[in-house]
Amino acid sequence: MTLGSPRKGLLMLLMALVTQGDPVKPSRGPLVTCTCESPHCKGPTCRGAWCTVVLVREEGRHPQEHRGCGNLHRELCRGRPTEFVNHYCCDSHLCNHNVSLVLEATQPPSEQPGTDGQLALILGPVLALLALVALGVLGLWHVRRRQEKQRGLHSELGESSLILKASEQGDSMLGDLLDSDCTTGSGSGLPFLVQRTVARQVALVECVGKGRYGEVWRGLWHGESVAVKIFSSRDEQSWFRETEIYNTVLLRHDNILGFIASDMTSRNSSTQLWLITHYHEHGSLYDFLQRQTLEPHLALRLAVSAACGLAHLHVEIFGTQGKPAIAHRDFKSRNVLVKSNLQCCIADLGLAVMHSQGSDYLDIGNNPRVGTKRYMAPEVLDEQIRTDCFESYKWTDIWAFGLVLWEIARRTIVNGIVEDYRPPFYDVVPNDPSFEDMKKVVCVDQQTPTIPNRLAADPVLSGLAQMMRECWYPNPSARLTALRIKKTLQKISNSPEKPKVIQ
């Protein structure tokens, strides 16, 4: 497949930046007022250290111009325009208001000088013969290689799960790369050298999220949108762990966030840790539920797909193309993304634990970070969890999954009634609960989130309500397994009362 006009060599590293100012890291100099025209603008103007104009062209789309303020990465202002990105910076009030940018035109291929007719008559037959021989050898090699691949290919892998679908128009170069013969033996990503090449060709476009780990940016690679998670230096172990898991086990699954590349780069005299994944414009399930109310069939679609992802993590697959069992350890609505087809995929494996039955080896990693206190199971809060038992970690995932089901159910419309989004235990703990706050509510008072009575009026939500209760048993071993949750939800989705929503 091809992407746009032909290009020779690797595309140069692009950088672009449009922000509305950074309240966490204010600039040291005086601020200027700038025109703000971007999807993330909160008004017609913003204030920052300088004003920016960025012109971005995604593959198959018309160029879009964004205006805003900049506080970080001033070195990007010195970048040269390319056929995908051009950026401009200035330092006076509203200096970016009437600025218009253009992209560098794609250079046409230079014409080859004509050859002498007599030389062509002599070399023509010779070259044709050599070409036929080369094609024959190449064809034989290709047939043998394809036969070897078919013998070793894992039956559960499908081509569709390996293609990055960043836009609906045109072909995907990244999809070609992920679908080619150069992927790693695990099938989880690209070889390390290819990963570093891809990482250095990504242009950062806009910051779409911030958290305790760092930032998430939307980037462009050859005109395709990708997500770039930039870890803070104090969270290096999370970056290392997530990179390690993606590069050593088979995690290609529709309901697990697709991994592309990982790299440690130096930008502006500081080290940055990048994790590049597929980009999903709906964002996290947490964000999606705050914006969107759900019909019962959509609530079920989200729940089933999340359960499929968790079941795939928890199961061990044997064989040369297998994977160890994995427990997430930080399952929550912020770590579940909503794809364009309104199915969920699970993200953030920085705290994951791996286990293989053959060696009975429990790989906990070396990360001092702990999970999110609001979603911790009672055995974690009262420090009774068996840290040497892999099943214990899976049981904590199930407790958290029940809380995510509760979040989905609250936003589901039944008889015209729906509640505002609230996090679990919103009515009994503060916004940022401490370990002791959660321990008192969950372990001492033995409280669980209140399940609204209205759920009993709908056959889908009544099943979800019962499932929540079975995820919240105080005895961890009595809780449902991820596989049982998946099968039960699929059975509900195929029941006569509701249409089939999971393909």
Curated annotation (Swiss-Prot):
Superkingdom of source: Eukaryota
The Protein kinase domain, residue ranges: 202-492
Outcome recorded upon mutating I417F: No loss of receptor activity in response to BMP9; mutant protein is capable of targeting the cell surface appropriately
EC number(s) recorded for this UniProt protein: 2.7.11.30
Result of changing A400T: Found in a patient with hereditary hemorrhagic talagiectasia; uncertain significance
Database matches in PANTHER family: SERINE_THREONINE-PROTEIN KINASE RECEPTOR R3, TRANSFORMING GROWTH FACTOR-BETA RECEPTOR TYPE I AND II
Assembly: Interacts with TSC22D1/TSC-22.
Family: Belongs to the protein kinase superfamily. TKL Ser/Thr protein kinase family. TGFB receptor subfamily.
Protein name: Activin receptor type-1-like
Source organism of this protein record: Homo sapiens
Phylogenetic classification of the source organism: Eukaryota, Metazoa, Chordata, Craniata, Vertebrata
